[in-house]
Amino acid sequence: MEMYETLGKVGEGSYGTVMKCKHKNTGQIVAIKIFYERPEQSVNKIAMREIKFLKQFHHENLVNLIEVFRQKKKIHLVFEFIDHTVLDELQHYCHGLESKRLRKYLFQILRAIDYLHSNNIIHRDIKPENILVSQSGITKLCDFGFARTLAAPGDIYTDYVATRWYRAPELVLKDTSYGKPVDIWALGCMIIEMATGNPYLPSSSDLDLLHKIVLKVGNLSPHLQNIFSKSPIFAGVVLPQVQHPKNARKKYPKLNGLLADIVHACLQIDPADRISSSDLLHHEYFTRDGFIEKFMPELKAKLLQEAKVNSLIKPKESSKENELRKDERKTVYTNTLLSSSVLGKEIEKEKKPKEIKVRVIKVKGGRGDISEPKKKEYEGGLGQQDANENVHPMSPDTKLVTIEPPNPINPSTNCNGLKENPHCGGSVTMPPINLTNSNLMAANLSSNLFHPSVRLTERAKKRRTSSQSIGQVMPNSRQEDPGPIQSQMEKGIFNERTGHSDQMANENKRKLNFSRSDRKEFHFPELPVTIQSKDTKGMEVKQIKMLKRESKKTESSKIPTLLNVDQNQEKQEGGDGHCEGKNLKRNRFFFW
C-alpha cells in the first residue's frame, strides 16, 4: 500500500472492503479489494480462487487484475477502477435503459459469459452490481469470488451461491449437479430488470423465491419436483400449479418482441432447455440491422483509447499472437544455442595442441662442416627461424632432429608474451647421440630453448620429472641474440666439456667392472642441489639399470645424463656464460 494513496471507500461486503486509491507514480486510479482477516478458511479460499481465475483468463469484457500483494496478513487485489455499474445506471434510469444502450450492454455481457463458458468456467454470481460500466460505455464482468470450473460427473458444488433474486431453481432446491445454465438464468432475470428498471423475482427467502418462480415462470420439472418433495427444508409445503402462455411475447408483454424471445429462452425451468451463450450471441436481436458489424469497430476503438489512458494496463494480445511470438522466441533461442555450441567446438579444436612434426635432416660433409638448417615454416605460415646458427664439429653420420613448436610464436613478443626480443621462441635443433663416437655431442647452446609444450622422444619422457623437463628454461629466463664474441666463448666451453665428458665416461666404465659385493656399497656422485633434487633419486635407479643393459651389449655406447644446473653452479665454474656486461641465465648440460 506504500505505492498507493487512499482516496476513500467504494463498498463493503461480507468478505472485505473495496477502497478507491491512486498510484503515486502514475496517478492512475485503482480499486483495491481487501479481504478480511478471519480464522476460517472460507475467506482465503474465495480470495485465492478469484486470483487464480483473473490471472488465468483475460478478455476485453472482464475486469483487469493489476497486481496482488499481502500486507498485515491481508490479501490485497488491485483492479482497474470503474466506479460505475449497471445498478447505478438503473438507479439513474428508473424505467429501464433505452433500447440502443441496452443492446450494446447485453452484447458485451454475453461476450464475457461466452468466454467463460467456452473455458468451462461458471461465474455463479451474475447480477447488476457485478457488471462494471466505464465512461466510454464498455461493460466488464467482475467479482470472481464465486467463480469455479465446471465439475466432473459425480462432483458437487457449494450449495449457497449467487444472490437470491437471480438464483436459478436448481440452486434454490440445492441441487449439487448444476452447471453453466445457472448463469443463463441469472442473465434472463437481469435483462428484464435492465429493460424495465425493476427486479423480476425479488424475494425475502428461498421459499418466497420458489413460489414466485412457479407463479411467473412455470411449474417445476419432474427432477426438481422430486428434490423438492424430499427436502426437509420444504417439508409440508405445497406449490401451486399455474398455467402459463407458451408465447414469449404474451408471457413478457413489457418487453420488446425479440428481447422477450431471448428472456423466454433463458428462463426455462429445466436447465437442459435453456439456451447457450453462443446461441444468444447469434440471436436475431443482435444480428438484425448489421448491429455486430457496426458495433465491433467502435468497441475496438474504445478499448484502445482506454488502454492508452491506463498506464498500468497494457492491451492483451490474442492467444494466437502469443503462440506465434513464443514460437519465434524459441526459434531464436535454439538458433543461438546451436551457433554458440558450434563456435565452442571450433574454439576447442583450436585450443588442442597440434602434433609435433619431427623432421630428420641428413648432414653431409666433413667433421667440421655442417649445412645450415632449412628454414621452418610453421603451420600458421607466420614465423620463420633465422637460418644462421653456430657451427660445431660433428661426425658425417650425425642426423639433426628438428622439433617444431605446435603453435607459431609471434616474433614481436618474447616467451612470456612481452614485446622484447624478436629471436625468442622457435624451433630447437637437437643432435641425437652418436653411437660410433665416445665423445657425446652437446646441443647448440646458441639455439633457442625448449618450449614447455614441445613433445620429446620416449627416452626423454622417461627422464623428465613432474616439476620440470630436462633442458627446460624457467619462465623468467631470457634469451638474446648471440654475438660473435659469445660464439667464440661457447666454442671454448664446448671443447672443455667434451674432454670432461670423456673423463666421466671412463670413470663409469671402471665402476661397472666392480664385483657384486662392491656394488652393494656403490655410491653415485651426488647431484647438484637443484629444484628437482628429490625427483632425481628415482631417475638414478633407472639410469643404473639402463647402463647395465647397455654395458652387456657394447662398452663403447654410453647414455648421457643431462642435468639442469642453476645459476650458482655456473658462477663456481669460472664465470662461463657472461655476455658483455649482461648476466644471462642459461641451461648447462653435464655429461658423465
UniProtKB/Swiss-Prot annotation:
Compositional bias of kind Polar residues: 466-477
Residue positions, PTM Phosphothreonine: T158
Basic and acidic residues bias spans: 368-379
Record PTM Phosphotyrosine, positions in chain: Y160
Region (Disordered): 368-390, 459-485
Compartments, record wording: Cytoplasm
Organism superkingdom: Eukaryota
Keywords: ATP-binding, Cytoplasm, Kinase, Nucleotide-binding, Phosphoprotein, Serine/threonine-protein kinase, Transferase
A GO-annotated cellular component: nucleus
Active-site residues from the entry: D125
Residue window of motif [NKR]KIAxRE: 44-50
Catalytic activity: L-seryl-[protein] + ATP = O-phospho-L-seryl-[protein] + ADP + H(+); L-threonyl-[protein] + ATP = O-phospho-L-threonyl-[protein] + ADP + H(+)
Pfam families in alphabetical order: Pkinase
Top EC class for this record: transferase
Record's comment describing the protein's domains: The [NKR]KIAxRE motif seems to be a cyclin-binding region.
Similarity comment text for this entry: Belongs to the protein kinase superfamily. CMGC Ser/Thr protein kinase family. CDC2/CDKX subfamily.
The protein's name in its UniProt record: Cyclin-dependent kinase-like 3
Protein encoded by which gene: CDKL3
